[in-house]
Amino acid sequence: MEDIFVARVMSTSIHTVTPDTLVEDAAQEMLENGIGSVMVVDDENHLEGILTTTDFVEIVAEQKPKDQTPVSKYMTTAVVTTTAQESIRDVADAMIEHGFHHTPVVDEDEGVIGMITTSDLAGYISHVQSPSPAE
């Protein structure tokens, strides 16, 4: 796994919103696309934060009006990111260490270019053929 890079397994079909997007609209984006997170970006596509299904637990618990509340109120801003050139082993280790399921893939010039998830990693591992046991 050490020689396999994030670019090989990441999803480039990304879903983004802006910090002023309403929570209701972000939730609709996630539901319509069957995804567990949206990345929050500025006008130049640089990452500002991430909003995940876990954040909606807090939104529901606080009973905030979802049609009036921007995602900036609930998004995580201290986001651990990776690059397309990073080893998937390093990314997997970081995801386990921090207990999260989504890692945005960023490029210094282009901003957000993809997402790698625990599902992406599991999908890759399930397609890798293991060597046969020595006889």
Where are the language model's segments positioned?
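Tandem CBS (Bateman) regulatory domains
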Residues: 1-12, 52-81, 87-98, 112-135
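The conserved cystathionine-beta-synthase
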Residues: 17-34, 41, 82-99, 106, ...
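A glycine-centered beta-loop-beta connector
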Residues: 30-33, 38-54, 95, 103-119
